[in-house]
């Protein structure tokens, strides 16, 4: 029997664009908006209005400078040969300064370009966080997205800033490159006695898997009750209807209890935030507090002690 599953199908309503809040605000800085059916396959069919402001403009400018700096270095490594540039693009790498430079400013070809690119990236990321915070504040929203983003910034800053400072050298920071970044990650684990024995790494992976599981469960649940209006979650939160009642009953039948239409989002944000929060702690402790996680695990009784 044919059934509306809603895995790939979507309903698009094309009307006048929603321009957002207009009361007591200047809208001259907002771009126009329009409807695009192809965009509607993934989300809302409307694109715009877009507001960058000072923080957004600074973020995009310095983000572009970071990207351009790395690209110029790759172009230099390719000998200014477009064929070699395209062929070896994934193999090129912008490396941090060698250990002998410590935390000092290095010559351009000895890691100075990496330091410049990292400065551009830091300004871009911080400015974007400011933009996320101020946009939420201007809309009268909670700052949940800014604080969640800050957790990701924590892991990023530990890798490229806090841990190198504690270790006394920029050389321990990751490079900018596709395969070189993967090699750095593998070598990091080898240098510190197998990262799998780092309990904070384990917590991070558990939260990562948990985030994927929660996302799949929540997405499947809402799609399963869209025929009853379940996608209108705000309405279901304040006035529980048959959609949320059926979804809740399904999970009580399945595993004995259920989240609420509001609570599942609290589960999701904390599970996602814990991925980068605990991951950053685990990275920060590696080499600064614990040199070898396998030996640490042996001492604490959960890794085998080989004779």
From Swiss-Prot:
Compartment(s) where it occurs, according to its Swiss-Prot or TrEMBL record: Cellular chromatophore membrane
Coiled coil (UniProt feature): none
Residues annotated to bind (7R,8Z)-bacteriochlorophyll b: 181, 201
PROSITE patterns found in the cross-reference section: REACTION_CENTER
Superkingdom to which the source organism belongs: Bacteria
MF-aspect GO terms: bacteriochlorophyll binding; electron transporter, transferring electrons within the cyclic electron transport pathway of photosynthesis activity; metal ion binding
An annotated GO BP: photosynthetic electron transport in photosystem II
Residue positions binding a ubiquinone: 251
Keyword Zinc carried by entry: no
Subunit structure, interactors included: Reaction center is composed of four bacteriochlorophylls, two bacteriopheophytins, two ubiquinones, one iron, and three highly hydrophobic polypeptide chains (designated L, M, and H).
The family this protein is said to belong to: Belongs to the reaction center PufL/M/PsbA/D family.
Protein name per the record: Reaction center protein M chain
Organism: Rhodobacter capsulatus (Rhodopseudomonas capsulata)
Gene encoding the protein: pufM
């Amino acid at each position: 029997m044919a059934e509306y599953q809603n895995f790939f199908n979507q309903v698009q309503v094309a009307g006048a664009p929603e321009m957002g809040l207009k009361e007591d605000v200047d809208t001259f800085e907002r771009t126009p908006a329009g409807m695009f059916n192809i965009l509607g396959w993934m989300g809302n069919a409307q694109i715009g209005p877009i507001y960058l402001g000072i923080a957004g403009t600074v973020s995009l400018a310095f983000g572009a400078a970071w990207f351009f700096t790395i690209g110029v270095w790759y172009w230099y490594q390719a000998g200014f040969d477009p064929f070699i540039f395209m062929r070896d693009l994934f193999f090129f790498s912008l490396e941090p300064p060698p250990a002998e430079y410590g935390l000092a400013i290095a010559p351009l070809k000895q890691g100075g370009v990496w330091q410049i690119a990292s400065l551009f990236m830091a300004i871009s990321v911080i400015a974007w966080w400011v933009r996320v915070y101020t946009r939420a504040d201007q809309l009268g929203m909670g700052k949940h997205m800014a604080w969640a983003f800050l957790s990701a910034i924590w892991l990023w800053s530990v890798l490229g800033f806090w841990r190198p400072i504690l270790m006394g050298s920029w050389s321990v920071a990751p490079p900018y490159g596709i395969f070189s970044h993967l090699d750095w990650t593998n070598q990091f684990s080898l240098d510190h006695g197998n990262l799998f024995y780092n309990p904070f790494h384990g917590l991070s992976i558990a939260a990562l898997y948990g985030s994927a599981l929660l996302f799949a469960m929540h997405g499947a649940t809402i799609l399963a009750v869209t025929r009853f209006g379940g996608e209108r979650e705000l309405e279901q939160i304040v006035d529980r209807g048959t959609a949320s009642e059926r979804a809740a009953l399904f999970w009580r039948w399945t595993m004995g209890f259920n989240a609420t239409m509001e609570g599942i989002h609290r589960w999701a944000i904390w599970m996602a935030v814990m991925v980068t929060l605990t991951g950053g702690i685990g990275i920060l402790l590696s080499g600064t507090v614990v040199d070898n996680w396998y030996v640490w695990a042996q001492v604490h009784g959960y890794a085998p002690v080989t004779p």
